[in-house]
From Swiss-Prot:
Gene Ontology molecular function terms on file: fumarate hydratase activity
Function: Involved in the TCA cycle. Catalyzes the stereospecific interconversion of fumarate to L-malate.
Quaternary structure (record): Homotetramer.
Site feature (Important for catalytic activity) residues: E331
EC number: 4.2.1.2
Similarity-based family: Belongs to the class-II fumarase/aspartase family. Fumarase subfamily.
Name under which the protein is recorded: Fumarate hydratase class II
Organism field: Caulobacter vibrioides (strain ATCC 19089 / CIP 103742 / CB 15) (Caulobacter crescentus)
Residue numbers binding substrate: 98-100, 129-132, 139-141, 187, 319, 324-326
Length: 463
């Protein structure tokens, strides 16, 4: 039988496994919210550790917290930050919308670990109390939003942006490598005028570059922190200067540019910054969906598709068709993008649900945001390393497409006019002949003139 100890809260005593650091409120949450399997994301757990350490440092500096207690809280919080106590954060996402249970989970774990460090009895709340000491100058209403912003900003900066830059570099390299390969363009999925394969991939690279810039542009607002607003934004029970000092400490711990939010009422009641940054991520997902689709369609075949690109062959593609290989990286990436689109709908709705002085959809916002960041970052690296870098052009097929395209007739607009050119193209399409055969045979111009005007390499730039 598992050994237990007694923990207490305002509802009375409750048994907790003796080897677990959490206390009564986390234990009650385990019983009250048996919903799903989605645990509180580890980046949020780390961020709660950062908040508790920063708050202890600020309270110590302001003379509110005994130095010995503060030092021990900081030591225990560091273990949370380092991931050493992850097993002691068992709560699911689906809990109170303020994140109170997860905040108390952090308070209790740090309290009991600090008590253990000081040689005390876990569950006694002495000499380190989860509310009076670990949660000093704080409310769940400002602590969880602060942790949410820290977690999301850290993941964007350290995981998402580097992954997107990795993809951008690979796409830009292909654009430079293929700058002289002329291919036929397509609009409305139909043949259009020529461009180079490098220009096409240069467009993809620019989409990702723009996406990176959009995300970076949103970060200053995401890095504004609610801490110091306490229950409703007034800062009740937080000493003067606490908000500014705790933000400074958080910036120091993370190495990121966190600041105190200029208006704590907005910071508690609305999470527009979360919606805004995720909107930029959603836009990147839209870009990635387009790029992944183009690449898999251009690589369709190998015998009966467009066949302009040869995609890396990573694994067998069919359990029934021998030799079949599929564009699996594009398929994985587009599924990720679909998930991000759904997450953005959730975040948009949740962000609108600030009722009076508090938004109570915090955990689901954090969960969906962090899932999007993790998925896009991982998928961008996978798509780059397992697809983009190994793509090769099928030059013969590309050349054949250019030679057979009727849209080269556009080069004759200036000499023959739109109507005559349209007639040449339609006749060639109807008869299964070439533009040259119809233009020269129909007496529109000589063979030499056709050679002079219809030059694909002259059709890939203005003029």
């Amino acid at each position: 039988m598992t050994a237990t100890r007694i923990e207490t809260d305002t509802f009375g005593p409750i048994e907790v496994a003796a080897d677990r650091y959490w206390g009564a409120q986390a234990q009650r949450s385990l019983g009250n919210f048996k919903i799903g399997w989605e645990k509180q994301p580890l980046p949020v757990v780390r961020a709660l550790g950062i908040v508790k350490r920063a708050a202890a440092e600020a309270n110590l500096a302001l003379g509110k917290l005994d130095p010995k207690i503060a030092e021990t809280i900081i030591a225990a919080a560091n273990e949370v930050i380092e991931g050493k106590l992850n097993d002691h954060f068992p709560l699911v996402v689906w809990q109170t919308g303020s994140g109170t249970q997860s905040n108390m989970n952090a308070n209790e774990v740090i309290s009991n670990r600090a008590i253990e460090m000081l040689g005390g009895e876990m569950g006694s709340k002495k000499p380190v109390h989860p509310n009076d000491h670990v949660n000093m100058s704080q409310s769940s209403n400002d602590t969880f939003p602060t942790a949410m912003h820290i977690a999301c900003a850290e993941q964007v900066v350290h995981d998402l942006l580097p992954a997107l830059k990795h993809l951008h570099k690979a796409l830009a390299a292909k654009a430079a490598e293929w700058k002289d390969i002329i291919k036929i363009g397509r609009t409305h999925t139909q043949d259009a005028t020529p461009l180079t394969l490098g220009q096409e991939f240069g467009g993809y690279a620019q989409q990702i570059e723009n996406g990176i810039a959009r995300i970076e542009m949103t970060l200053p607002m995401l890095m504004q922190l609610a801490q110091g607003g306490t229950a409703v934004g007034t800062g009740l029970n937080a000493p003067v200067g606490f908000a500014e000092l705790v933000a400074e400490q958080i910036a120091g711990i993370t190495g990121l540019g966190f600041t105190t939010a200029p208006n704590k009422f907005e910071a508690l009641a609305a999470h527009d910054a979360m919606v805004f940054t995720h909107g930029a991520i959603n836009t990147v997902a839209a870009s990635l969906f387009k790029i992944a689709n183009d690449i898999r369609f251009l690589g369709s075949g190998p015998r009966a598709g467009l066949g302009e690109l040869s995609l890396p062959e990573n694994e067998p593609g069919s359990s029934i068709m021998p030799g079949k290989v599929n564009p699996t990286q594009s398929e994985a990436l587009t599924q990720v993008c679909a998930q991000v689109f759904g997450n953005h709908s959730t975040l948009t709705f949740a962000g609108s649900q600030g009722h009076f002085e508090l938004n109570v959809f915090n955990p689901v916002m954090a969960y969906n945001f962090l899932q999007s960041v993790r998925l896009v970052a991982d998928a961008a690296i996978s798509f780059t390393d397992n697809c983009v870098v190994g793509i090769e052009p099928r030059v013969d097929n590309i050349k054949k497409g250019v030679e057979n395209s009727l849209m080269l007739v556009t080069a004759l607009n200036g000499k023959l006019g739109y109507d005559a050119c349209a007639k040449i193209a339609k006749t060639a399409h109807k008869n299964g002949t070439t533009l040259r055969e119809e233009a020269v045979g129909g007496g529109y111009l000589t063979n030499e003139e056709f050679e002079q005007y219809v030059r694909p390499e002259k059709m890939i730039s203005p003029g």
